[in-house]
């Protein structure tokens, strides 16, 4: 049974979906320990995330690996690369740098709120302008 795609998910939608699906798993606490490992990477199930986003797993993998990781990858002072998404990190397959993903999502959410405020204020200005025109037309008669 294939996945029906209505539209491709946005970067914000992909990050939000992964965050919501795996937030309770971070940090991973091994049985018998009180503190989780200081490992920022969580293994994700690309197929499950794709299913939740109603897109094909192959497209989601490509989006994560070829676009988002390339877009957000950076080098630290020592030359080590920090990845958002890695094919394999230690024993983990399809590893996502969860703290980094969380920070990127927070920035996307902030930008989204700013855009909503801008659109809302623009709509309010438009309504007030229309009301002023109507008031002028009514009082001019």
Located regions from the model:
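N-terminal extramembrane/targeting module of integral membrane proteins
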Residues: 1-43
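C-terminal single-pass membrane-anchor helix
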Residues: 107-141
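Zinc-dependent metalloendopeptidases
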Residues: 43-44, 70
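Juxtamembrane amphipathic/hinge helix adjacent to a transmembrane helix
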Residues: 84-115
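Extracytoplasmic/lumenal ectodomains and periplasmic regions of secretory and membrane proteins
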Residues: 52-96
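A short acidic, leucine-rich amphipathic alpha-helix
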Residues: 46-50
